[in-house]
Amino acid sequence: MTNIRKPPLLKIVNHSFIDLPAPSNISAWWNFGSLLGLCLVIQILTGLFLAMHYTSDTMTAFSSVTHICRDVNYGWLIRYMHANGASMFFICLFLHVGRGLYYGSYTYFETWNIGVILLFAVMATAFMGYVLPWGQMSFWGATVITNLLSAIPYIGTTLVEWIWGGFSVDKATLTRFFAFHFILPFIVAALVMVHLLFLHETGSNNPSGLISDSDKIPFHPYYTIKDALGIFLLLLLFMTLVLFFPDLLGDPDNYTPANPLNTPPHIKPEWYFLFAYAILRSIPNKLGGVLALIFSILILMMFPILHVSKQRSMMFRPLSQCLFWILVADLFTLTWIGGQPVEHPFITIGQVASIIYFVIILFALPIISMLENKLLKW
């Protein structure tokens, strides 16, 4: 057995997945890392097979997707696995980030910051992928979101036209989006390796937030079997979605070919961007909205700076727990608002929810943490 662990490549695998010392008390919330790895593999494989049949031309893109679904062997399955795989990816991502916030994993600066960059990269990939079927929502989503860059002073308009490759979203835009959508997942995979590299420098956090060096167990067989259960449950949920409700999370407008002369009644992105879209729409000023949109994700990088509690995890901090779950409820509210038309009362609800989002993170959590520090001495 020791001989198997000697070759350089196998040594890397061994140190990462077999003999890796892991805390003995990590819960099911630590399963999402491996599930995200599975989602990435599914997305790259299904995407590769879709790319074999897809054509990135405005005249034939929509038809090629139809051709994949109707004429290619199991093309419908590959297409729906890819579309719903993105949704599963983001569900796991949000839960993974939420776990990091709850248990204070953000104190591993490098791992956390690479993770936030990963989140941005995956969001960019998903956005460009949504444009490729060239349906109504693809076209108008691309137009609206890329047009936001025109809010940048001086260079905005030129930048947008440079990204479009013309004066509107057209053939050049679709071709370059396809090229970027193809290459980005491999960049994401490389970033994942860096993410794991930094994680294995420090070791995993655990629910208590305490140093667990005195109580480590080998990753295999304990966590390999635990991850296998997580993978089985994810695949069960995923294939139920793909085979029974493939269009549940999609937009019916995207079954209409893109038409620059006809605007859909409600332009909205995929469900996983709705919370950020609601924050964007809640600010009347264009540049302000764009900055709020970017900052709503970038604010994750501020968590290590804003952490003032003497305890790392929220496990023993009931007041912070309360705020955390209010934040989760607020994000659900923002997601709902993002999918609603821009009219009363949704505008006001969106503005209030956006303010609550930033207030909780920037002010409420640090203040409550300081109060809890005081209560420790009580």
Curated annotation (Swiss-Prot):
The keyword Heme belongs to this UniProt entry's keyword annotation: yes
UniProt-reported outcome of changing T240I: In strain: Isolate B9 and Isolate D1
UniProt-listed GO biological process terms: mitochondrial electron transport, ubiquinol to cytochrome c
Binding site for heme b b562: H82, H181
InterPro entries: Cyt_b/b6_C, Cyt_b/b6_C_sf, Cyt_b/b6_N, Cytb/b6-like_sf, Cytochrome_b, Cytochrome_b_C_euk/bac, Cytochrome_b_N_euk/bac, Di-haem_cyt_TM
The keyword rRNA-binding belongs to this UniProt entry's keyword annotation: no
Main location: mitochondrion
Record function comment: Component of the ubiquinol-cytochrome c reductase complex (complex III or cytochrome b-c1 complex) that is part of the mitochondrial respiratory chain. The b-c1 complex mediates electron transfer from ubiquinol to cytochrome c. Contributes to the generation of a proton gradient across the mitochondrial membrane that is then used for ATP synthesis.
The name this protein goes by in its record: Cytochrome b
Gene that this sequence comes from: MT-CYB
